[in-house]
From Swiss-Prot:
Residues 7-16 have a biased composition (Basic residues). Belongs to the bacterial ribosomal protein bL32 family. This is Large ribosomal subunit protein bL32. InterPro entries: Ribosomal_bL32, Ribosomal_bL32_bact, Ribosomal_zn-bd. Residues 1-21 are annotated as: Disordered. Keywords: Ribonucleoprotein, Ribosomal protein. One of its GO terms (biological process) is translation. One of its GO terms (cellular component) is large ribosomal subunit. GO terms for molecular function: structural constituent of ribosome. The keyword Ribosomal protein applies.
Length: 55
């Protein structure tokens, strides 16, 4: 098993963890239905950029 040779400092631990933060998904309100959906995705009722794309 891998065992560290030397203890890592709080600063090094923080540097490693600096990229671990999660970001929330970008949400948009649909022009037609006013529904909230993810950017560049079709809404649940089939609208994309104000047009019905799924019947």
């Amino acid at each position: 098993m891998a065992v560290q040779q030397n203890r890592k400092t709080r600063a090094k631990r923080g540097m490693r963890r600096s990229h671990d933060a999660l970001t929330s998904a970008a949400l948009t309100v649909d022009q037609t239905s006013g529904e909230i959906h993810r950017r560049h995705h079709v809404t649940a009722d089939g609208f994309y950029r104000g047009k019905k794309v799924i019947a």
